[in-house]
């Protein structure tokens, strides 16, 4: 290297990297978090409640009032409540799992009934149990008046696009259901990772789920389901090109307009995925009208998502739509 020793270059580069990391850490820890700016407040499509059941996940002190106070603090006008990480209990395929889901949905519906202008319900399903899921969809929509459905990205050795689940998809399509897909570490890749390592598997499994919907024709056969992929699409925005190039030749009937057109039917919420580099990839991949606001509260602090939004690569009009307007189209009862 001309004029600079290799050792000096490495030391200088390391120092610069350390400084950049320190600056980033300082910003993360100390930058004031601003409320959303959307008129009427944002709509949070990824917001968890903690049901009164054994092993419930989330803040043990959670109440609807806790959510409402946090929402008021950050100008969030409405939140769609869904279940969080208890897939093994809910997807056991047993009568007990059906009863557990029913208890959770009844509790979530009571929270909504007490705060109908602020809260909505994405009802859970005993998804591994097809007949139980069909009964729960009927109950959740016709009795509880839910706003949509929440499912997990995989169960056992199956992902939601598997033909085994077609009867469920047919009914969700008939209902024109918004469906939030919450990731879980799949059985195939749950290797007892040390703390912090399994986090990536959530995003990888969300991407496997999207592939499953694609190659099994769910996105084509059931176009009225509004699937919502969490955390900005997982790793899908950066993997989609490889997925496109490796699409099976014997399944071309499911991509009449190509792979990109199918993936662009999906919606993408940005809870804990609002870093600029993530959103740059998402903006190239998905139309801004398909991007939704979410927080992953209570497992994740609302500040985690809001802190990064000032750096988002969207115009003010696009951010307004992401914060509220896009979700109003999926959940019209919250329309101003």
Predicted regions and their residues:
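Acidic-and-aromatic substrate-binding clefts and catalytic sites of carbohydrate-active enzymes
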Residues: 56-62, 89, 127-133, 156-163, ...
């Amino acid at each position: 290297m001309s004029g600079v020793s290799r050792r000096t270059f490495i030391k200088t580069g390391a120092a610069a990297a350390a400084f950049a990391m320190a600056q980033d850490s300082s910003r993360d820890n100390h930058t004031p978090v601003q409320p959303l700016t959307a008129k009427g407040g944002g709509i949070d499509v990824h917001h968890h409640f903690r049901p009164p059941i054994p092993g419930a996940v989330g803040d043990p002190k959670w109440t609807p009032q806790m959510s409402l106070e946090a929402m008021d603090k950050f100008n969030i006008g409405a939140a769609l409540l869904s279940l969080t990480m208890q897939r093994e209990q809910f997807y056991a395929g047993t009568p007990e799992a059906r009863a557990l889901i029913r208890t959770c949905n009844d509790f979530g519906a009571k929270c909504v009934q007490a705060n109908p202008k602020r809260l909505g319900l994405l009802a859970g399903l005993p998804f591994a149990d097809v007949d139980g899921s069909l009964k729960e969809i009927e109950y959740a929509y016709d009795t509880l008046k839910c706003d949509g459905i929440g499912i997990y990205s995989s169960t056992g050795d199956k992902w939601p696009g598997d033909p085994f689940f077609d009867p469920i998809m047919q009914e969700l399509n008939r209902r024109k259901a918004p469906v939030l897909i919450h990731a879980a570490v799949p059985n195939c890749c749950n290797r007892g990772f040390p703390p912090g390592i399994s986090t990536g598997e959530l995003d990888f499994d969300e991407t496997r789920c999207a592939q499953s919907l694609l190659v099994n024709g769910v996105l084509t056969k059931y176009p009225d389901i509004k699937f919502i992929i969490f955390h900005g699409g997982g790793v899908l925005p950066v993997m989609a090109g490889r997925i496109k190039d490796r699409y099976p030749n014997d399944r071309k009937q499911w991509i009449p307009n190509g792979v990109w057109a199918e993936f662009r039917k999906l919606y993408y919420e940005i809870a804990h995925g609002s870093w600029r580099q993530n959103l740059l990839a998402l903006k190239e991949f998905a139309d801004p009208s398909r991007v939704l606001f979410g927080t992953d509260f209570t497992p994740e602090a609302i500040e985690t998502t809001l802190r990064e939004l000032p750096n988002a690569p969207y115009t003010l009009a696009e951010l307004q739509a992401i914060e509220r307007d896009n979700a109003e189209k999926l959940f019209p009862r919250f329309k101003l």
